[in-house]
Amino acid sequence: MSKYILAVDEGTTSARALVFDEDLNVISIAQTELTQYFPRPGYVEQNPEEIFEKQVSMIKKAVEKAKIEISQVSAIGIANQRETTIMWDSRSGRPVYNAVVWQDRRTSDITDWLKSNYLNLFKSKTGLIPDPYFSASKIKWILDNVPGVREKAERGEIKFGTVDTYLIWKLTNGKVHVTDYSNASRTMLFNIKKLEWDRDILEILEIPEAILPEVRSSSEVYGYAEPVGNIPISGDAGDQQAALFGQLGFSKGDVKCTYGTGSFILMNSGEEIYDSKDLLTTIAWKIGKDVKYALEGSIFTTGAAVQWVRDGLGLVSSSDEIESLASSVVDNGGVYFVPAFSGLGSPYWDPYARGLIIGISRGTSRGHIARAVLESIAYQVRDVIEVIKKDVGKEFVNVLKVDGGVSKNNLLMQFQADILGIRIVRPRVIETTSMGASMLAGLAVDYWSSLEELKSKWAVDREFIPSLQEDRRERLYKGWKEAVRRTIGWAREVETME
């Protein structure tokens, strides 16, 4: 009887489960949308119980669609939206508050204070720049603002987890409270040099260490999924680190970009921890005793900008239509779009930037707006690649591997090659986040024997070669940089006018 690996891909907007065979073919996909709540400007929340219930439902549905028995699944690997913060009562198992999503900006005041007083400490210990993006300030906000939670936490009655931790805890019926090194490194509480929770930071933020999960490797058996046949849960990684693994980014210098709700560029930096002023240093994964680090640029709004064109502007009826609309014009017509809906991430790190469309004339059409939106994605990726080249050397970034749903857009991928001036490689299976989770799970239970075996099963779908002349490339990019300059600090400036 054939055996399979199941990936849980718990994203920002959907709960997904995928079944892979030993040749890394996707046998089935089950997916359902998750509800997001926006109770106040800057707030983004989800219901943790909805996340769990829908994820279990998708596991069962993926197995059913694959026309296999649950007993044929050798292991489960989890990849999750990172930083999103869940806290729950350890006795009842009930969340004490909604999940505070990584996009949430309510804690800007806390992180401004941390930046002003402890920037170098946080950067040197965690590799991260204080920002509402990460879990630490979200935890502090819940402890300080939800009645009774701090008192319960002090008594050891509260547990914290990123989404992977919560899912594993629920799947194991409360038996296992763990996370992996990649997810721990995104909390802004984890010392990436000492590989432990940092007590100095916990003291600054007044966070009890007892609420934190045990940190384990990214590929080992953590426990068994009781609601779905007691399958071993043996892979765990943050979604972007999982995607780097799924792109075979095993060697120093390997770079990938995942185009999803946001876009995330990771470069495997091996065992070296780079001190970058504008990028994040994070843990890619730990397998056995081997810890790999990565440089990361985090772009908050890319695929979400395409959704805005569909839902907010009504220019297209489906996200797929944006490519044909953007292709109806030969260029952007001088229009630039900066999608700073919730601030700007790497390399600007400005929570007060706000969105902008500039360069509009009477000749501007729907096509120009659509094209400017797509081009904004590529420009933001170049912003990050420029900093990587500056930090580690130009010789490291000659090829960019791409994945995620938005990478199916051929117009965008060609423009990405053009604006970077390097080759873009899209794999046959763009579900690399799920594939990476499957690989980590499969390696732990000897479903696959080695990284070399995995390399032999990976294939390319298409390569995009740059065709834009360098002077044109640089003129376009200069226009983008000027547009970004005009968005910086906008929300703060407006506040001072009131």
From Swiss-Prot:
GO cellular component terms, semicolon-separated: cytosol
Q: What is its EC number?
A: 2.7.1.30
- Source organism superkingdom: Archaea
Keyword Endoplasmic reticulum attached: no
* This protein's pathway: Polyol metabolism; glycerol degradation via glycerol kinase pathway; sn-glycerol 3-phosphate from glycerol: step 1/1
Q: Any idea which positions bind glycerol?
A: R82, E83, Y133, D239, Q240
Instruction: Give any GO molecular function from the UniProt entry.
Output: ATP binding
Per the record, the GO terms for biological process are: glycerol catabolic process; glycerol metabolic process; glycerol-3-phosphate metabolic process
- Residues at which sn-glycerol 3-phosphate binds: T12, R82, E83, Y133, D239
User: What InterPro entries does the record point to?
Assistant: ATPase_NBD, Carb_kinase_FGGY, Carb_kinase_FGGY_CS, FGGY_C, FGGY_N, Glycerol_kin
Coiled coil stretches, renumbered: none
Into which family does the record put it?
A: Belongs to the FGGY kinase family.
This molecule's function is given as: Key enzyme in the regulation of glycerol uptake and metabolism. Catalyzes the phosphorylation of glycerol to yield sn-glycerol 3-phosphate.
Q: What is this protein called?
A: Glycerol kinase 1
Its source organism is Sulfolobus acidocaldarius (strain ATCC 33909 / DSM 639 / JCM 8929 / NBRC 15157 / NCIMB 11770)
